[in-house]
Amino acid sequence: MEKIVLLGYMGCGKSTIAQNLSKITQIPFLDLDICIEKRANLSIKEIFEQHGEIYFRKLEHEMFLELLQSSENAIIGLGGGTPCYANNHLLLQRDDIVSVYLKASIDTLYNRLVHNKSKRPLIANMDEEEMKEFIAKHLFDRSFYYNHAQHKVAVDNRTIDETVQDILDILA
C-alpha cells in the first residue's frame, strides 16, 4: 500500500502536480475536497453555508483518515487548510505514507492566484496589497502545520515537470 500526500497553500499546484504524478506512477489521484463533496452530496461551499466550518473540518478529518486507511494505493491532495485542523498534521508523519509540502513564496502564490480570483471566494474581492497580506498571514499561521510534512519541495521558478521529478526522486 502506497500513500503519497501532497499539501500546501492554494495555488501551490497540488492538483496539477498530483494529476501529472498520477499519470507517471499509475497511482490514482484523490482530491480530498472532491471526496468530501461526493460523500456529502454537497459542494464545499454548500457544506460551509449549511453546516458551518466545524462540521466541514470533522468531515474532512474523517475522509482523510478513511483515505489513509484504505488498502488502495493513492496520491492524496489535501485542501490548503487540512493540516491545520483535527491534528491532521500528525498524520503527515505516519510511517506508511510519504507526505510532501509543496512550498511556494508569497509572490509565486499571488501570481498564480491573481488570474483566477473569481474561483476563490476568500480572495475574490481583494486588491493586490490585501491579497499579498492575506497570503502572508495564512502562510505564517499554517507554516507550523505544513512543516510537519516529511519532505518539502520548493515550487518557485520550477515547472510542473521539474516539481514532479523532485517528488519522483523522493519516492525512488
Swiss-Prot record:
Where does the UniProt annotation locate this protein? Answer: Cytoplasm
- Amino-acid positions noted as binding substrate in the UniProt annotation, renumbered to this chain: D33, R57, G80, R142
Q: Does the keyword Magnesium apply?
A: yes
Q: What is its main location?
A: cytoplasm
* Pfam families in the cross-refs: SKI
Please list the residues that bind Mg(2+): S15
Q: What keywords are annotated for this sequence in UniProt? A: Amino-acid biosynthesis, Aromatic amino acid biosynthesis, ATP-binding, Cytoplasm, Kinase, Magnesium, Metal-binding, Nucleotide-binding, Transferase
Q: In which pathway does it act?
A: Metabolic intermediate biosynthesis; chorismate biosynthesis; chorismate from D-erythrose 4-phosphate and phosphoenolpyruvate: step 5/7
Q: What HAMAP family does this protein map onto?
A: Shikimate_kinase
Assembly and binders: Monomer.
Family named by the database record: Belongs to the shikimate kinase family.
The record's function comment reads: Catalyzes the specific phosphorylation of the 3-hydroxyl group of shikimic acid using ATP as a cosubstrate.
- Which protein is depicted? Shikimate kinase
